[in-house]
C-alpha cells in the first residue's frame, strides 16, 4: 500500500474517510492503523468508521476467546497464540479512545458475566463478601450492569491476555482510561484460580501507572485498592500465589508512582512491616527478593518525602538521618549475603556486623532475628552451622523475645536439629549451649516471661516425638532458669501443656528418666494461683500416663512436701483437696504423702497404691498387714480377686519380721482347691519373698509343682487369644516359683530309668512350654533363668564327663539356641532386653564353653561361633550385649584358660575373642549421647546421687568398654599355647597384616585393635614359640602397611620379637631384613620404620652390651644411620637427623672411636638447633621404650597418643582400675596426658574471637544491595540489559556443572544468546548450584545435537562469523592482534573430545588460546571465559 503520509497529503478528508471505511470492510486493519497513526485526521466524530472498527475488534476477540461445545469452564486447557491481526487491533484501541471506551464497557460485561457465573468457585465466602464485593458494587454504580446484553461463552484467560497486549501498547502513551475494567480485574488477583490470578498479575505490569494515578486522585478507589491488597496477603496464607500477587502489586506500585494516601496509612501500621518480615523469612527465594525490594523502596521513599513514622518495627522523623539510612543499608547488605546470594566467607567476615545489628538503636531487634532465621534455613549446611554458632553468641537476649513466633517456629526448632548434638569427650557442647541460651533468654526477660514460657512449652509439645536429647537440653534450660532465679512462674495454662508433655515417651529409659524428671521438677515452681488440687491432678496425670508407676515421681516426693509447706496455706490447701478426695485413689495417696491429708478412706486399692509408691507411711501399716493376712487366708473379704495383689508385697513397712511371721499354707491350699491365675501369681511372689527370709516357708514337693503347672496350663488355655500377655505372665510366675523352689530342693536323679529322673522330667516340661504352651517373652525369660540355674548347679566340669551330662548340656544349649534364633529372626525388641542378656549368659555359660573347648558335643563350637558373630554384629547399635559376652568369655578363661590343650583347634574361640575386641559401635549422635545425658541426670537432676549409683549402669549395666577390658583379662588368663595360636591364626586368617581396602578408616581401626591384642599376647607369653614362618609374614607386611597407626604396633611387635631373637642367638634373618629396608631409600616410610625398630632393639639390649651382639648391631646401625642423615629423600634425612637427638645421649658411652664420636656429636649439635617443640615434634619424639612402655595404658592407646595427634581408641587408667581383674601380670600404668600430642586446631574461624573483625571493615557485597531493587517484570528488564550480538553454542557440552558455569559467565559478560542441547538442564541441581540465578536472565535457546549445523547455517545467513574454540593445525592464535567480528558465533566442543569433524567443516575459523605450560588443554568453563571476555573487551 502507498505510504500513509502520501495519502494524507494528496487525498482530501472525505476520500481518506472513504478509504479507511473500505479498508475496514476488507479487514485491512493494519493499513487502517498506519493511516490513523500518520494522518492528522480525526475520525472519532465519524460513527461510520468508529462503529465498524469496534465491531471488527470485538469480532476478532470473540473468535480468539470463544470456547466450543457445551462445557461451561472459565477457560480452555490450551489457547492459540495471539496472531498479528489481534495485536494490530490492540494498537488501534490505544489510538482510538472513543473505540476503547466502548470496548472497555463491552469487555467489562464479558468478564462480569464469567465472574458472576463462577463467583463461589473464584472467591471464598468471607473474602468474597467483605473484600471483593465492593469492587463489583462500584462497577455497578458506574456501569449499569443490569442492561440486557448477549451472554457469550468466552475464555477468561484469552480475554485477559488480549487486555495485557492492549495495556502493553498503551504503557508509554497512557492514552486510555479503564477504571470500570479495574473494578473487575483487580479482584481477580485474589481469586482461587492460580492461572487467572497469575494472568491478572502479568497484566498489571503494564497498567500499574494508571492504577497509581487513580489511587492518588480518587480517595475511594485508593481505599478500595489497599483494603483489598492488605486482605489479599492475609487470604494467601494457604494459597501462596495470592501472597505473591499482593507483594508483586505493592512492589510495582512503589516502583511506578508516588505513595498514595491509603498506602501511606498502610505503611504506618505494624501489619505492613510484619508482612515484610514474614516474607523476608519465607522459604521461597522469590518471595524473599520481593520483600527485600519492597523494604528498600519503602524506606527510600519515606526518607525522600520526609514522612514521620512511629511503628514497632520502623521509626523515622521528618528527615531521616544518614546514620539511620546507613543502618538499613547494612541490614539489606547482610540480608542479601545470608538469604539471597549466600556466601559463607562473606558471612564470616561480617560476623561483628551481624552481632551488632541486635544493638543497633535504629533497627528493631526483630530484623536481626530475620538474619538468623534465614541463615538457619540455608541450603548450605556450613552456613546453618555458622549461623547457629552466631545465634548462641548474641548477648542481647531481649532481642529474641521481640518475635516469639520466629523464635519458636524457626530459631529454637533449628537449634533442636539432631545433627548439631555432637559429643566431645564426655559432654555435648551444643546441648549445653542450648540450655544456657534458654536460661539466659528467660533470665533477661523482664516482661512477658509467662508468654515466652508458654510458647516454649508449646514448642516442646509440638516436638513431643522429635529427637529426645534436644527436648532434654531445651527443657533443662527452663529448669536451670527456675533454679537460679527462684521464680514461681508455672500457671494453669503452663500446667495444661506440661500434662501433654507427660504423654510423650522417650526412646529408652535413660532419656525417659531424664526428661520426665525435668518435667516433674517444673512443678516445684508453680505460681501462687495454682491450687493444691491442680498440682495433684497434674501428678496423677503423669502417673497414669506412665502406666501407674511412681518411679519418676518417687524421688521427688520430699521436694513436693517442702513445696506444700512453703507454698501453700495449710488450711486452704486441705479445704481445696477435700472436694476431690475419694474420687481417685492416686489423688488420695498424693494428698496423704505431699499434704499429710488424714481424712482418707483406706481401701485395698489405696494400700496397693501405697506399696507401689514405696513411701514409708507408718499410719497405714497395720491395715496393710490386716489386708495381707486376708490375702494369705485364700479368701479375702469384700470379694477381692487378687488382681494387682502382688504389688502389695512391695509395701515399704513390711520388714523381715513380717515375712518370718506369716503362714502361707492356707493360701497354698486355696490355690490348689480354687485355682485362679491372679491368686497363683500372688502365691508365687510371696513364696519368693518368704524364701529370702527363711527356708521353711511351706512343705512343697516336686509333684506339687508339676500339678500346679497343669493348673496354670488349663487356666491359661481358657484365656482369649488377645490375652496372651496374661498367659505369658502366668507361666513366668510358675517358672520363677520353680527356680526358687529348686534353690532349697535337690532334684532326685536316682531313678533306674535315666530319662525318668526329676531333672529329665523338668527338662521335658521346659521343652513343652517353649514349643507348645507358651514361648513368649516373660515365660521364656523365666525358663532361661531356670535352665541357667540347672547348668550352674547340676553340671560339673572335669576331665571326664558322663553321657547324661553331655545330653543335659546339649539339650539346654539347644533350647537357648532355639529361643535366640526365634527372637533374632524378628529383630530384637528393645523392651525384651532382659531376655536377650539372659540368653547370652546362657549360651556362653562357662560350662558350655568348656564342653565346646573339649569337643564333647559335635557342632557345638560352630554354633557358638555363629551366635557370637550374630551378637557381635548386633552390638553395633545395641548396648549391653558386648560387655556381657566379653564378661562370659572372661569367666571361662579365668577358670579354664590354663587348661586349654595345644592339640585342639581353638580358632572358633580366638575368632570370638578378637571379634568382641575389635567390634566398632555406632558413631551417630543419639548413641553417643546416652552416657552424656546419664551424667547430666546424675550430677544435675538426681537429688540422691552417690558415686557408683549412675543411671547409665542401672539401665544398661557396665560401660561398653568393659567388653574390651574383659578380652584383655581373657588374654592374660590364657596359657601360652593359646596366645601363640592367636598370633599365628589372626595374622594368617584375618586382614591384620594387609588391609583389604587401604583407604577404609573403619577397617584401619579394626586392624589397629587386632594388633593391640597381638602385642599383648606376645608380651605376656613366657615361652617364645612363634614360628619363623609367621614372623617372616609379619616382617614383610610392614612394607605394604598403609595405616600409620597400625605401623606403630607392627614396629613395636617386631622390635620386641627381634630382641627375643638376639637373646636366643638367632637374629640374623631379622637383622638382614631390617637393614635391607634401611638401605633401600625408594620407600622412605619403611626406612623410618626400620630405623625405629633398630633403635628400640638397641635400647633394650644396651644393659647387656657384652652379650647378644649389641656392639655389632650398634656399629652396623650407626654406619647406616649417618649416610641416611644425608639422604636425598627428605623424610629419611629429617628423621635420621632427629633420631640422633636421642641416639647420642643414649649410646655415646658405647662409642669408642674418636672420629665417629665427633661425627655423631656434630650431627647431634646441628639437629638440636633445628629441633621444634610443641605440636610438631621432631623424629625422636616418635620413639618409645620397649620396657618403659610395657604397661596396659600404653599398649592400648597411650603410645599412639604420645607419637601422633590422630584420634585413636584409648583405655584409661581409671577404666582398667575399675574393670580389670588380673592386675598382676602387666602393670596398668598411668594416663600420661602431659606427653600426649594435641589435635591440630583446624577451626580458623572462632565466633568468640570478637576482636578479630574491625568495626570499620567494609561489608563485602556483590551487588550493591541498597541501590539495587528487584525488577519484578524480568522480561521487560532483560530487554533493558545491554547485550552483545555474540552467540555461544554450548550444545556439545553435556555436564550440568560446566553448563551452569558457562551460563553464569555469559550473563556476567553480556552475551546475546546461549544455546544448550536440552533446556531442561536449567532444572538440574548441579546446574543451579553453579549458575545460581543466571538462567533467569540469560537468553537461552535449545539446539539439539543434530540441529547444530542447521542452526549455524541460519546464523551465517544473518551475517554471523562461525568460530570454533579448538586446537587444529590451522587455528588462529587468540592474542592482542585478533579482532572479533561484531556478529560472532562461538562453538564450544565437548569436554573430552572437542569439536567433531563434521562441525569443524562448517566453521569459518578456529581460535586457539595460547598456552605456555605443560598441560595441553584447559577446563571448558575457563576456556569459554577467556574467549568471551576477549570479545566483550572489544565490543562492549
Swiss-Prot record:
Compartment(s) where it occurs, according to its Swiss-Prot or TrEMBL record: Cytoplasm
UniProt-recorded Gene Ontology molecular function terms: RNA binding; tRNA (guanine(18)-2'-O)-methyltransferase activity; tRNA (guanine) methyltransferase activity
Main location: cytoplasm
EC number(s) recorded for this UniProt protein: 2.1.1.34
Reactions that this protein is recorded to catalyse: guanosine(18) in tRNA + S-adenosyl-L-methionine = 2'-O-methylguanosine(18) in tRNA + S-adenosyl-L-homocysteine + H(+)
Record keyword Lipoprotein present: no
Family membership: Belongs to the class IV-like SAM-binding methyltransferase superfamily. RNA methyltransferase TrmH family.
Ligand binding (S-adenosyl-L-methionine): 1365-1367, 1389, 1409-1418
Organism of origin: Saccharomyces cerevisiae (strain ATCC 204508 / S288c)
Keywords for this protein: Cytoplasm, Methyltransferase, S-adenosyl-L-methionine, Transferase, tRNA processing
GO CC terms in record: cytoplasm
CDD domains: SpoU-like_TRM3-like (cd18091)
Identification of the protein by name: tRNA (guanosine(18)-2'-O)-methyltransferase
UniProt-listed GO biological process terms: cellular response to oxidative stress; tRNA methylation; tRNA nucleoside ribose methylation
Miscellaneous section: Present with 861 molecules/cell in log phase SD medium.
Function: S-adenosyl-L-methionine-dependent 2'-O-ribose methyltransferase that catalyzes the formation of 2'-O-methylguanosine at position 18 (Gm18) in various tRNAs.
Disruption of the gene: reported phenotype: Increases cellular ROS (reactive oxygen species) levels. Increases RNA level of TRM7, TRM13 and TRM44. Sensitive to oxidate stress induced by hydrogen peroxide and rotenone. Mildly slows cell population growth.
Amino acid at each position: 500500500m502507498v505510504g500513509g503520509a502520501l495519502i494524507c497529503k494528496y487525498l482530501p478528508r472525505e476520500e481518506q474517510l472513504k478509504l479507511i471505511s473500505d479498508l475496514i470492510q476488507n479487514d485491512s486493519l493494519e493499513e487502517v492503523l498506519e493511516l490513523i497513526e500518520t494522518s492528522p485526521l480525526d475520525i472519532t466524530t465519524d460513527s461510520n468508521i468508529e462503529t465498524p472498527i469496534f465491531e471488527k475488534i470485538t469480532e476478532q476477540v470473540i473468535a480468539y476467546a470463544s470456547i466450543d461445545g457445551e462445557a461451561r469452564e472459565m477457560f480452555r486447557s490450551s489457547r492459540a497464540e495471539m496472531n498479528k491481526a489481534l495485536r494490530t487491533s490492540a494498537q488501534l484501541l490505544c489510538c482510538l479512545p472513543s473505540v476503547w471506551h466502548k470496548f472497555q464497557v463491552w469487555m467489562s460485561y464479558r468478564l462480569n458475566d464469567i465472574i458472576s457465573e463462577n463467583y463461589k468457585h473464584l472467591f471464598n465466602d468471607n473474602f468474597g463478601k467483605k473484600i471483593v464485593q465492593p469492587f463489583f458494587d462500584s462497577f455497578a454504580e458506574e456501569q449499569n450492569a443490569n442492561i440486557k446484553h448477549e451472554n457469550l461463552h468466552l475464555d477468561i484467560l484469552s480475554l485477559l491476555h488480549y487486555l495485557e497486549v492492549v495495556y502493553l501498547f498503551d504503557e508509554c502513551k497512557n492514552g486510555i482510561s479503564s477504571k470500570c475494567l479495574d473494578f473487575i480485574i483487580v479482584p481477580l488477583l485474589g481469586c482461587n484460580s492460580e492461572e487467572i490470578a497469575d494472568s491478572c498479575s502479568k497484566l498489571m505490569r503494564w497498567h500499574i501507572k494508571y492504577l497509581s494515578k487513580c489511587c492518588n486522585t480518587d480517595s475511594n478507589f485508593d481505599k478500595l485498592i489497599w483494603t483489598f491488597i492488605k486482605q489479599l496477603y492475609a487470604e494467601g496464607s494457604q494459597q501462596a500465589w495470592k501472597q505473591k500477587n499482593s507483594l508483586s502489586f505493592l512492589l510495582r506500585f512503589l516502583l511506578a508512582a508516588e505513595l498514595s494516601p491509603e498506602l501511606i496509612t498502610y505503611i504506618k501500621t505494624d501489619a505492613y512491616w510484619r508482612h515484610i518480615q514474614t516474607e523476608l523469612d519465607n522459604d521461597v527465594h522469590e518471595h524473599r527478593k520481593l520483600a527485600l525490594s519492597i523494604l528498600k523502596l519503602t524506606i527510600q521513599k519515606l526518607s525522600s518525602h520526609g514522612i514521620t513514622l512511629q511503628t514497632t518495627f520502623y521509626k523515622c522523623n521528618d528527615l531521616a538521618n544518614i546514620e539511620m539510612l546507613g543502618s538499613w543499608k547494612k541490614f539489606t547488605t547482610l540480608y542479601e549475603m545470608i538469604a539471597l546470594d549466600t556466601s559463607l566467607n562473606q558471612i564470616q567476615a561480617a560476623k561483628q556486623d551481624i552481632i551488632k545489628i541486635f544493638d543497633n538503636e535504629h533497627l528493631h531487634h526483630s530484623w536481626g532475628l530475620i538474619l538468623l532465621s534465614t541463615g538457619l534455613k540455608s541450603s548450605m549446611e556450613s552456613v546453618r552451622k555458622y549461623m547457629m554458632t552466631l545465634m548462641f553468641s548474641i548477648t542481647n537476649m531481649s532481642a529474641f523475645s521481640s518475635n516469639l513466633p520466629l523464635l519458636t517456629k524457626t530459631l529454637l526448632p533449628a537449634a533442636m536439629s539432631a545433627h548439631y548434638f555432637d559429643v566431645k569427650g564426655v559432654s555435648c557442647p551444643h546441648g549445653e549451649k542450648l540450655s544456657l541460651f534458654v536460661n539466659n533468654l528467660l533470665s533477661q526477660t523482664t516482661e512477658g516471661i509467662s508468654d515466652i514460657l508458654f510458647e516454649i512449652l508449646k514448642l516442646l509439645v509440638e516436638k513431643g516425638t522429635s529427637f529426645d536429647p534436644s527436648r532434654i537440653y531445651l527443657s533443662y534450660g527452663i529448669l536451670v532458669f527456675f533454679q537460679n532465679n527462684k521464680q514461681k512462674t508455672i500457671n494453669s495454662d503452663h500446667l495444661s501443656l506440661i500434662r501433654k508433655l507427660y504423654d510423650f515417651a522417650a526412646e529408652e529409659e535413660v532419656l525417659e528418666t531424664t526428661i520426665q524428671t525435668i518435667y516433674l521438677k517444673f512443678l516445684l515452681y508453680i505460681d501462687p494461683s495454682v491450687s493444691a488440687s491442680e498440682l495433684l491432678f497434674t501428678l496423677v496425670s503423669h502417673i497414669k500416663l506412665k502406666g501407674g508407676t511412681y518411679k519418676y515421681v518417687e524421688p521427688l516426693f520430699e521436694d513436693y512436701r517442702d513445696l506444700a509447706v512453703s507454698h501453700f496455706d495449710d488450711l486452704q490447701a486441705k479445704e481445696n483437696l477435700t472436694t476431690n478426695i475419694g474420687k481417685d485413689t492416686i489423688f488420695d495417696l498424693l494428698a496423704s504423702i505431699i499434704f499429710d491429708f488424714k481424712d482418707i478412706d483406706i481401701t485395698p486399692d489405696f494400700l496397693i497404691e501405697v506399696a507401689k509408691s514405696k513411701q514409708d507411711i507408718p499410719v497405714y501399716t497395720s491395715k496393710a498387714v490386716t489386708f495381707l493376712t486376708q490375702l494369705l487366708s485364700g479368701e479375702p473379704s469384700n470379694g477381692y480377686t487378687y488382681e494387682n495383689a502382688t504389688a502389695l508385697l512391695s509395701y515399704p513397712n513390711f520388714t523381715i519380721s513380717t515375712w518370718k511371721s506369716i503362714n502361707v499354707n492356707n493360701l497354698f491350699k486355696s490355690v490348689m482347691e480354687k485355682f485362679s491365675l491372679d491368686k497363683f501369681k500372688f502365691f508365687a511372689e510371696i513364696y519368693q519373698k518368704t524364701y529370702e527370709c527363711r527356708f521353711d516357708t511351706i512343705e512343697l514337693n516336686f509333684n506339687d509343682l508339676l500339678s500346679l503347672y497343669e493348673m496354670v496350663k488349663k487356666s491359661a488355655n481358657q484365656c482369649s487369644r488377645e490375652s496372651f500377655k496374661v498367659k505369658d505372665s502366668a507361666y513366668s510366675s510358675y517358672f520363677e516359683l520353680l527356680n526358687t523352689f529348686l534353690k532349697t530342693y535337690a532334684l532326685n536323679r536316682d531313678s533306674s530309668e535315666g530319662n525318668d529322673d526329676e531333672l529329665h522330667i523338668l527338662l521335658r516340661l521346659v521343652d513343652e512350654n517353649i514349643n507348645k504352651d507358651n514361648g513368649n517373652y516373660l515365660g521364656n525369660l523365666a525358663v532361661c533363668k531356670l535352665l541357667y540355674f540347672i547348668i550352674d548347679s547340676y553340671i560339673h566340669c572335669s576331665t571326664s564327663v558322663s553321657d547324661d551330662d553331655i545330653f543335659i548340656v546339649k539339650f539346654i544349649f539347644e533350647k537357648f539356641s532355639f529361643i535366640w534364633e526365634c527372637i533374632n529372626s524378628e529383630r530384637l525388641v528393645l523392651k525384651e532386653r532382659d531376655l536377650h542378656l539372659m540368653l547370652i549368659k546362657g549360651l556362653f555359660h562357662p560350662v558350655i564353653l568348656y564342653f565346646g573347648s573339649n569337643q564333647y558335643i559335635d557342632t557345638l563350637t560352630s554354633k557358638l561361633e555363629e551366635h557370637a558373630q550374630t551378637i557381635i554384629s548386633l552390638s553395633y547399635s545395641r548396648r549391653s550385649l558386648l560387655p556381657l559376652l566379653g564378661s562370659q568369655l572372661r569367666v571361662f578363661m579365668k577358670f579354664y584358660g590354663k587348661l586349654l590343650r595345644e592339640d585342639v583347634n581353638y580358632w572358633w574361640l580366638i575368632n570370638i575373642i578378637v571379634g568382641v575386641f575389635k567390634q566398632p559401635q555406632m558413631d551417630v549422635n543419639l548413641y553417643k549421647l546416652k552416657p552424656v545425658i546419664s551424667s547430666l541426670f546424675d550430677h544435675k537432676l538426681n537429688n540422691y546421687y552417690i558415686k557408683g549409683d549412675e543411671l547409665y549402669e542401672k539401665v544398661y549395666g557396665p560401660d561398653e568398654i568393659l567388653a574390651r577390658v574383659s578380652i584383655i583379662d581373657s588374654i592374660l588368663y590364657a596359657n601360652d599355647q593359646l596366645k601363640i595360636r592367636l598370633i599365628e591364626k589372626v595374622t594368617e586368617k584375618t586382614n591384620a597384616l594387609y588391609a583389604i581396602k587401604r583407604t577404609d578408616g573403619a577397617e584401619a581401626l579394626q586392624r589397629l585393635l587386632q594388633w593391640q591384642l597381638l602385642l599383648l599376647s606376645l608380651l605376656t607369653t613366657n615361652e617364645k614359640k612363634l614360628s619363623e614362618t609367621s614372623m617372616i609374614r609379619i616382617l614383610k607386611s610392614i612394607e605394604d602397611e598403609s595405616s600409620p597407626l597400625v605401623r606403630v604396633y607392627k614396629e613395636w611387635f617386631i622390635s620386641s620379637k627381634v630382641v627375643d631373637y638376639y637373646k636366643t642367638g638367632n637374629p640374623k634373618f631379622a637383622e638382614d631384613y631390617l637393614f635391607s629396608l634401611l638401605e633401600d631409600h625408594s620407600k622412605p616410610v619403611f626406612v623410618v620404620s626400620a630405623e625405629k625398630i633398630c633403635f628400640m632393639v638397641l635400647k633394650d639390649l644396651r644393659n647387656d652390651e657384652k652379650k647378644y651382639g649389641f656392639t655389632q648391631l650398634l656399629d652396623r646401625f650407626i654406619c647406616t644411620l649417618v649416610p641416611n642423615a644425608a639422604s636425598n629423600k627428605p623424610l629419611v634425612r629429617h628423621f635420621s637427623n632427629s633420631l640422633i637427638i636421642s641416639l647420642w645421649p643414649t649410646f655415646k658411652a658405647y662409642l669408642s672411636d674418636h672420629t665417629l664420636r665427633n661425627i655423631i656429636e656434630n650431627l647431634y649439635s646441628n639437629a638440636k638447633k633445628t629441633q621444634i617443640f610443641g605440636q610438631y615434634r621432631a623424629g625422636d619424639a616418635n620413639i618409645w621404650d620397649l620396657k618403659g612402655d610395657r604397661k596396659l595404658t600404653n599398649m592400648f592407646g597411650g603410645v599412639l597418643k604420645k607419637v601422633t595427634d590422630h584420634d585413636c581408641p584409648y583405655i584409661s587408667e581409671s577404666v582398667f582400675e575399675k574393670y580389670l581383674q588380673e592386675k598382676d601380670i602387666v602393670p596398668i600404668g598411668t594416663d600420661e596426658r602431659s606427653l600426649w600430642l594435641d589435635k591440630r586446631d583446624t577451626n580458623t574461624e572462632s565466633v568468640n574471637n570478637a576482636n578479630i573483625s574491625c568495626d570499620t571493615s567494609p561489608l563485602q557485597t556483590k551487588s550493591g544491595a541498597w541501590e539495587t531493587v528487584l525488577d519484578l517484570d524480568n522480561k521487560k528488564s532483560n530487554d533493558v540489559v545491554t547485550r552483545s550480538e555474540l552467540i555461544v553454542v554450548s550444545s556439545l557440552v553435556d555436564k550440568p556443572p560446566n553448563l551452569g558455569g558457562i551460563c553464569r559467565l555469559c550473563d556476567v559478560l553480556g552475551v546475546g544468546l546461549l544455546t544448550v542441547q536440552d533446556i531442561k538442564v536449567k532444572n538440574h541441581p548441579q546446574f543451579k548450584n553453579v549458575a545460581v540465578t543466571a538462567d533467569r536472565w540469560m537468553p537461552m535457546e535449545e539446539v539439539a545435537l543434530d540441529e547444530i549445523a542447521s542452526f549455524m547455517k541460519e546464523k551465517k545467513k544473518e551475517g554471523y562469523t562461525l568460530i570454533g574454540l579448538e586446537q587444529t593445525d590451522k587455528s588462529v592464535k587468540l592474542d592482542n592482534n585478533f579482532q572479533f567480528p561484531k556478529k560472532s558465533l562461538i562453538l564450544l566442543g565437548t569436554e573430552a573430545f572437542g569439536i567433531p569433524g563434521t562441525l569443524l567443516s562448517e566453521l569459518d575459523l578456529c581460535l586457539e588460546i595460547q598456552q605456555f605450560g605443560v598441560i595441553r588443554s584447559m577446563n571448558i568453563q575457563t576456556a569459554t571465559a577467556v574467549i568471551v571476555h576477549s570479545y566483550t573487551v572489544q565490543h562492549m
